[in-house]
Amino acid sequence: VAKAVWFKEVASEKLLEQLDEKWIDEALEMTGTATMRRRRLPAEQVVWLVLGMSLYRELTIPEVVAKLGLSLPGERGLTVAPSALPQARARLGEEPMAWLFDKCSEKWALESARKHAWRGLSVFGIDGTCLRVPDSKANRAHFGGQSSSEEKGESGYPLARLVTVMALRSHLLLGARFGSYDTGETTLAKELWPMIPDNSLCIVDRGFLSAPGLLPYSLQGANRHWLTRAKKNTAMRVIRKLGKGDELVELNISPEARANDPSLPEHWTARAVRYQRRGFQ
């Protein structure tokens, strides 16, 4: 436990050290939040406060202020009341933080992926999960949740759907999208595919094996590849054998998918590699 706490402390400090202060100014200017500087709490200080609150969740807000060494003067040099800090965070809104996240993730994840390339390809992965959010009427209405039988009712907490694209060698996020529990992972992933650069390989699980996501990703760029395990019931027709356990195959695209995107063809091709690990059937 002590080692985990130490690692978290070092990682948090390292992240804050790598954060360019100019990006915070840009985030405020690009989202029209710079006018907050005229208030008692400078907007850039509030951004640092929100970052600290996310990294040091076990600390109170005043403790975060002290740990980061933030200077939060009030009017006429008076100290800002602790109750003003949550209000300042709410005034800041999500736009500057979202802009800052996109800026940091794009720079750090792309640099890392290029540095740890495999056979000249930057390696990424897309996957999804569900997160519990605070139980409130607003969150239940917005996110929904898992429902079961009438006797058991709904899940204990509202659930948000999260899909991310990650540089796999470093685990740095390139992008993230949230949605309601009823929103499918492939739907959220549509906004993430364009973030992946050329000369890349994206590894996904079987749930993402669909033409609407994979086909545009591979065709609307240069040297883009994807890799996934196929489901046992995946229908494919062999076009040509390339070697032992190596085939060029054709897969059908459903009428529903083509109705949603008329640009999709009736079929698409992929390379199928078949193998069996020792001890597995």
Model region roles, listed by residue range:
Residues 60-76:
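DNA-recognition alpha helix
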Residues 77, 94-97, 113, 198:
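Secondary-structure boundary/capping residues
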Residues 109-117, 133:
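Long amphipathic N-terminal alpha/beta scaffold segment
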Residues 75-94:
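Major-groove recognition helix of helix-turn-helix-like DNA-binding domains
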Residues 78, 117-118:
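Short helix-terminating capping/connector loops at secondary-structure junctions
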Residues 71, 92-95, 107:
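A short structural micro-motif
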Residues 1-64, 89-92, 99-103, 119-122, ...:
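Single, function-defining residue in the core of a domain
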Residues 69, 84, 197:
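Acidic/polar active-site rim loop that often engages polyanionic ligands
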